[in-house]
Amino acid sequence: MSQETYELKAEARERVGKGSARELRRNGLIPAVIYGDKQAPIAIAINTNEVTKRIHAGGFMTTVATIEVDGKKHKVLPKDYQLDPVRDFTLHVDFLRVSGNTQVTVEIPVHFINEAKSPGLKVGGVLNIVRHEVEVHCPADAIPEFFNIDLSGKKIGDSIHISEVTLPKSVTPVIDRDFTIATIVAPAGGVDESAAEAEGEAEA
């Protein structure tokens, strides 16, 4: 499951546009919008520090939140945010309204485990990561936090495909082909022969 949900307080904003957005930012607020679920969009302002903390904590785009706007609570999933390219602060956030049966498309990070059990890595092979994240369809209330990719037994030349990853029943990849997530390749200087021999003897 994704990270534990959290709550943010916001205020509805009547004025929109660049001038209004600049004024909000000067006052420590970020302009944002809540949309979707067949309801009218709501322009809101949220606390800059609270949102920045959530973004930097990780999992921001895959964690469902509750935003309270003038006493009414909205269950949402962040869909996009804009950062200032120079000063690296948040300029705007888009939130999608969700309910328990809402299907969402999210990018889930992959974690590699059991590196020490990979013969290819033991002899100096390099893990070449093709995809750091996998885009999937899933219910809003069942977003995985990450996918574990097991490297046990993987040798130089081996590839890890999405078909080797155990996905929850309600989660399906956006791409329907059996795409590659990572490969184990020989190092630029070649394989350490003594290490390879030792590994071969250990397997014998």
Curated annotation (Swiss-Prot):
| Gene from which the chain derives | rplY
> What protein family is recorded?
Belongs to the bacterial ribosomal protein bL25 family. CTC subfamily.
Function, please?
Answer: This is one of the proteins that binds to the 5S RNA in the ribosome where it forms part of the central protuberance.
What highest taxon heads this organism's lineage? Bacteria
GO BP annotations, alphabetical order: translation
Query: One GO CC annotation, please?
Result: cytosolic large ribosomal subunit
Q: Which UniProt keywords apply?
A: Ribonucleoprotein, Ribosomal protein, RNA-binding, rRNA-binding
Q: Which CDD domains match?
A: Ribosomal_L25_TL5_CTC (cd00495)
Matches recorded under InterPro entries: Rbsml_bL25/Gln-tRNA_synth_N (IPR020056), Ribosomal_bL25/Gln-tRNA_synth (IPR011035), Ribosomal_bL25_b-dom (IPR020057), Ribosomal_bL25_C (IPR037121), Ribosomal_bL25_long (IPR001021), Ribosomal_L25_dom (IPR029751), Ribosomal_uL5_bac-type (IPR020930)
Q: Any idea what this protein is called? A: Large ribosomal subunit protein bL25
Does RNA-binding show up as a keyword for this record? yes
MF term (GO), any = 5S rRNA binding
Q: How would you summarize the oligomeric state and partners of this protein?
A: Part of the 50S ribosomal subunit; part of the 5S rRNA/L5/L18/L25 subcomplex. Contacts the 5S rRNA. Binds to the 5S rRNA independently of L5 and L18.
